[in-house]
Amino acid sequence: MTTPPPLSPPSDWIMQQAQNWPDGARILDFAAGGGRHCCTLDHAFPGRFSFVAIDRDHAALAALKARCPQIEICQFDLEDTNIWGFADDGFDIVIVANYLYRPRLDDLFGLVRQGGYLAYETFATGNEAFGHPSNPDFLLQDGELAARLPDDFTILDYFHGRIDQPKPAIIQRLAAKRQPRNF
């Protein structure tokens, strides 16, 4: 059996957000790649959460499964225009890191259950000065995520600016909670 390649370090910010998430939460790691967030969270908080990792990259998901066999994986083209078949009842928490596809943002927000959380961190305008990504299609404008959130989300944390670790970049972070329905 081949040992999977080492993971890149997880986002410290996402790890901090996880400290506030409820026990027993079902978490979707969206565009999970090799599992740097779901695997690290699963090891940091053993038995506290259950995970579904989705990505289109079969090799990355195979490495994730070898590393963390208890995590459910789903290979799917995240930019497919068909209805997503992996999200029948949504998730308590949705994690997105270093991924942006604007045409599906509304669908992505819809994956968060009522009372659930969204933790989104990706590159933003200005990152061109630091290299990849530099294509505007993959860079958020300041305030863009907040402006796109449905009205039933409350923003808990927001940042748009430069970071220096793990390497210099311009990023945007948004943590939000979807409000429970009022019956």
Q: What is the role of each PLM region?
A:
Residues S50-D55:
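Conserved SAM-binding motif I beta-strand of class I
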Residues G24-G33:
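Conserved class I S-adenosyl-L-methionine
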Residues W84-I93:
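A short acidic, Gly/Pro-enriched loop at the edge of an enzyme's catalytic core
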Residues G116-G126:
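Conserved beta-strand signature within the Rossmann-like core of class I S-adenosyl-L-methionine
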Residues M1-P22:
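S-adenosyl-L-methionine
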Residues D57-A59:
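Conserved SAM/SAH-binding beta-strand->alpha-helix loop
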Residues L100-F109:
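A short, conserved alpha-helix within the catalytic core of class I
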Residues G34-P46:
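Conserved SAM-binding loop of SAM-dependent methyltransferases across substrates and taxa
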